[in-house]
């Protein structure tokens, strides 16, 4: 459903020009207080190519816009291919016939309008501080002061959402029933938080997940307070291919083979939360069936046993030994270094990370295992290549839009590796994979495109840069007096549709 857009994007026959019309009457929240124009969307897109506002999606999905920088720019670049012939028209000119992909990617947050006259002073800092002074166009805003500073945001503690006084209901399809929303952050004990929701009043879950014991209880005692949303996503354990011994594909295949993926799934609640994964494109996304569906081919013997196969793991470790990796005669890693593994400190992710650590230890790996907040996991460790994290057990990717490219390009294309906010957690940079992704990305939606990405998915799986273990269904819980509405795109509660009974 179009939001700020007045209608769906129009794509030229050669797939190199995209035209979008936006609605009139949509205004920024205080202190900007003016109507949104396409110049604000142009600036929003341009700023994501700046080194001050690094965003892996910029080059991953929008890198074919004419004039787009190939690497993060100093300052905010002016991109010739993002054009605004009038205040309600946005035109994107592309260097390659990728109109279908770029148009689909316009749903992503980096296209949310940003007023340049207000944001430039924040974007001039490295990193930008606009996120601490952000303005809004929807029904809600984070409480702020007259200068725009977010007084309603207490980092790692809470967020206060209030109504945006400039929101005009006639321009929006969202009902926005609630007048005020309080968000608690920093809930390191997910069991306590989840039980508080189920037994409390006017509460819904945020971006955390209820631990497995609570989920089982919710499925039996609180059935009317539980929704399972097909997530269109894959959870996996990433191995840094830039760090020894994970620069060796046979070592990675051995890790994949030894992994008890069912034990991993049990940490989140068992079969209720999804099917055991063996590759990266999930069910419900074009390319899934083309790549073999639920069952791996016999050629991928390391992916065949969800409970793990020590014999197959040993076979691949001995292959790695022949290539010079220090491995004992019985197939255990003989290196003495401790490999940095960073997991989340909240269940069920914490338990998943602990199970993952056990799998590596089965093969003789010595770990330096750190647990941090979910936010820090990405912003300071797994999303920052210079942090030199060898193993990220709590990563995964969920649909940016319903197309296989969104699961392959930002996560496994070496050209998408970023110094911050990096989503290619294994840092896979295989020239053949990169070339195949670039070739498939210009294909129009349809069987040829989906088969091409299925083949790439197979090729990536064969390299084993990560161990996929769950095709996710997201469990959402709410208090008994809440009429929650799930957002099937982002797989969280939609606060703009949720109400109190």
Each predicted region: which residue ranges?
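N-terminal lobe/hinge region of extracytoplasmic solute-binding protein
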Residues: 1-13, 135-137, 141
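Gly/Pro-rich hinge or "lid" segments in bacterial periplasmic/extracellular proteins
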Residues: 76-77, 97-100, 105-176, 180
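Ligand-site clamp/hinge motif
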Residues: 128-134, 160-217, 366
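Append "and occasionally in soluble cytosolic enzymes with long acidic Gly/Pro-rich linkers
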Residues: 149, 157, 162-163, 247-358, ...
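Detector for C-terminal structural segments
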Residues: 258-293, 345-358, 380-501
């Amino acid at each position: 459903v179009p939001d700020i857009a007045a209608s769906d994007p129009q794509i030229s026959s050669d797939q190199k020009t995209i035209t979008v019309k936006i609605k009139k009457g949509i205004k920024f929240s205080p202190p900007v207080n003016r109507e949104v124009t396409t110049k604000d969307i142009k600036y929003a897109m341009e700023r994501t190519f700046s080194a001050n506002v690094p965003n892996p999606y910029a080059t991953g999905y929008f890198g074919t816009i004419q004039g787009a920088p190939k690497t993060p720019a100093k300052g905010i670049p002016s991109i010739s291919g993002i054009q605004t012939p009038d205040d309600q028209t946005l035109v994107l000119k592309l260097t390659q016939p990728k109109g279908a992909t770029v148009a689909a990617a316009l749903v992503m947050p980096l296209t949310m309008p940003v007023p340049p006259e207000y944001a430039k002073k924040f974007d001039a800092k490295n990193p930008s501080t606009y996120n601490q002074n952000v303005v809004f166009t929807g029904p809600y805003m984070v409480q702020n002061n007259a200068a725009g500073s977010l007084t309603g945001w207490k980092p790692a503690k809470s967020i206060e959402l209030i109504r945006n006084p400039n929101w005009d209901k006639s321009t929006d399809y969202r009902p926005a029933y609630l007048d005020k929303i309080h968000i608690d952050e920093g809930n390191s004990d997910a069991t306590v938080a989840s039980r508080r929701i189920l037994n409390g009043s006017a509460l819904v879950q945020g971006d955390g997940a209820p631990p497995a014991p609570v989920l089982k209880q919710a499925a039996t005692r609180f059935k009317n307070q539980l929704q399972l949303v097909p997530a269109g996503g894959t959870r996996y354990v990433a191995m840094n291919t830039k760090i020894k011994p994970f620069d060796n594909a046979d070592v990675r295949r051995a890790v994949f083979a030894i992994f008890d993926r069912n034990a991993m799934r049990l940490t989140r609640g068992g079969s209720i939360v999804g099917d055991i994964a063996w590759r990266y494109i999930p069910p419900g996304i074009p390319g899934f069936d083309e790549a073999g569906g639920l069952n791996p081919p016999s050629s991928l013997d390391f992916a065949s046993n969800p409970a793990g196969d020590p014999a197959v793991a040993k076979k691949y470790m001995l292959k790695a030994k022949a290539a010079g990796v220090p491995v004992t005669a019985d197939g255990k890693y003989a290196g003495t270094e401790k490999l940095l593994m960073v997991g989340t400190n909240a269940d069920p992710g914490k338990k998943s990370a602990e199970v993952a650590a056990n799998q590596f230890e089965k093969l003789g790996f010595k770990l330096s295992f750190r647990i941090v907040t979910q936010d820090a996991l990405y912003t300071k460790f797994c999303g920052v290549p210079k942090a030199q994290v060898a193993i990220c057990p709590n990563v995964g990717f969920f649909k940016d839009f319903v197309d296989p490219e969104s699961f392959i390009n930002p996560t496994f294309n070496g050209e998408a590796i970023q110094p911050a906010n990096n989503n290619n957690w294994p840092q896979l940079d295989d020239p053949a994979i990169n070339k195949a992704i670039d070739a498939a990305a210009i294909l129009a939606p349809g069987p040829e495109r989906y088969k091409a990405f299925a083949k790439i998915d197979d090729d990536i799986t064969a390299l084993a840069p990560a161990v996929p273990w769950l095709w996710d269904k997201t469990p959402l819980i709410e208090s008994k007096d809440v009429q929650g509405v799930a957002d099937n795109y982002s797989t969280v509660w939609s606060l703009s549709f949720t109400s109190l009974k």
